[in-house]
Each structure stands twice: as structure tokens, then as C-alpha cells.
Design a protein with these regions (language model features):
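Catalytic cores of phosphodiester-bond-cleaving enzymes
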Residues: 22, 41, 50-69
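An active-site-proximal structural segment forming one wall of the substrate-binding cleft
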Residues: 1-12, 16, 37-56
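Surface-exposed, active-site-proximal loop segments in enzymatic domains
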Residues: 19-38, 174
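Glycine-rich "substrate-gating" loop/helix at the edge of Rossmann-like oxidoreductase active sites
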Residues: 38-39, 71-73, 105
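A short, mixed-charge helix-start or loop-turn motif at secondary-structure junctions
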Residues: 28-35, 64, 68, 127-128
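Histidine-acidic metal/acid-base catalytic patches
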Residues: 3, 9-11, 24-26, 59, ...
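Substrate-binding cleft and catalytic face of glycoside hydrolase catalytic domains
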Residues: 14-25, 61, 67, 74
Length: 177
């Protein structure tokens, strides 16, 4: 992914603990491996990838995914685990992609989590929960979340990764509102 990003001029890539197939389905759950083995393998792989990312000048954003609705069987499901791995590897090119939708489903406490890990958040994804629709259609107070990101000093990108409740134009209007 890092080499492909460099080739096309992309500045960052999103990475996951498990390969995802069509519709975001986890390809292999690795049920035969313990969580300790999975964690150590992920650390070793990310350490090598971080070296490559540093050499190529590409940022990698490690995304935890919800395991209740969209990505059953995904290993990385909590911000804390991803952020602590990033802290241990200590590369400016490896950070967490904090997906508010996924983390609302897995762990809640969005503002507390942002406060605790803002130093390792490299990108933010936005969609409301439940449903993964535009802000204002679910239970997340996005005005509060965005204000909190700003108050914590987050200066990175915020991307909208969602399924419009009606159509794209209406979703864009809701996002701007």
C-alpha cells in the first residue's frame, strides 16, 4: 500500500488489522490464533511498515472497525489498542484513523477517547450511528465532537464516510448545516 500510495502521489493510506472483502466482510478471522499472537504479529508488521512509510514519506492510518454490525471478526476494535501500538512504534508516519461511527458502536465515550488519544489521531471519519448515515440522523452529537476535536488541538482531516439516508445532495446539506 505504501509503495502504491507513493506511485500515485497519495499522502496517506488506511490500514486494517484484517483483510476486508466485498462489502467490508472480514476475509479471515484467524480464529486459530490467540489475541496475543495476533497483537504481536500486528506490532511486528506495523513496525516494518512504519520504516517503509518513513522512507517513502507516506502516512499510515490504522483504523479500528466495529465488530457488531459491519465487520464481524475484525481483530482491531478499540482505539486504545491501536493508539498504544502507534505509541510503542513511535513513528510520526503511523497514527490512528479514528472513525467516530465505528467507535460509537464498539466503545462509546467519544470525547473521552479523543482526549486520551488525540496525540495519535492522524485522520477522522464521520458517520452517525446507528445506520452509518449523515450527521444528525442518529445518536451522536457531532457539533460537540467537532468542537471537542478542535479544543484538543486536532488539526488533521475529517472525512465523511457514510451512506446517505436519502440522496447525496441532501447528505451534503446535512453535513454543511
Amino acid at each position: 500500500s505504501v509503495e502504491a500510495a507513493k506511485k500515485i502521489g497519495a499522502k496517506s493510506v488506511t490500514i486494517h488489522s484484517n483483510a476486508l472483502g466485498d462489502g467490508g466482510v472480514v476475509v479471515n478471522h484467524y480464529d486459530d490464533l490467540s489475541d496475543t499472537v495476533k497483537l504481536c504479529s500486528m506490532y511486528d508488521m506495523l513496525l516494518e511498515c512504519a520504516k517503509m512509510a518513513e522512507k517513502e514519506g507516506v502516512n499510515m492510518n490504522l483504523e479500528a472497525l466495529n465488530i457488531t454490525t459491519d465487520h464481524v471478526g475484525n481483530f482491531l476494535k478499540y482505539t486504545q489498542v491501536g493508539a498504544e501500538i502507534c505509541r510503542l512504534i513511535n513513528s510520526s508516519r503511523l497514527n490512528v484513523l479514528y472513525d467516530v461511527y465505528h467507535m460509537q458502536l464498539n466503545e462509546g465515550c467519544i470525547c473521552d477517547t479523543i482526549t486520551n488519544y488525540v496525540d495519535r489521531i492522524g485522520h477522522v471519519h464521520v458517520a452517525d450511528a446507528p445506520g452509518r448515515h449523515e450527521p444528525g440522523t442518529g445518536e451522536i452529537n457531532y457539533k460537540k465532537v467537532i468542537r471537542h476535536l478542535e479544543a484538543c488541538g486536532y488539526q488533521g482531516f475529517v472525512g465523511y464516510e457514510l451512506f446517505p439516508m436519502t440522496d447525496t445532495a441532501a447528505a451534503v446539506k446535512a453535513i454543511i448545516a
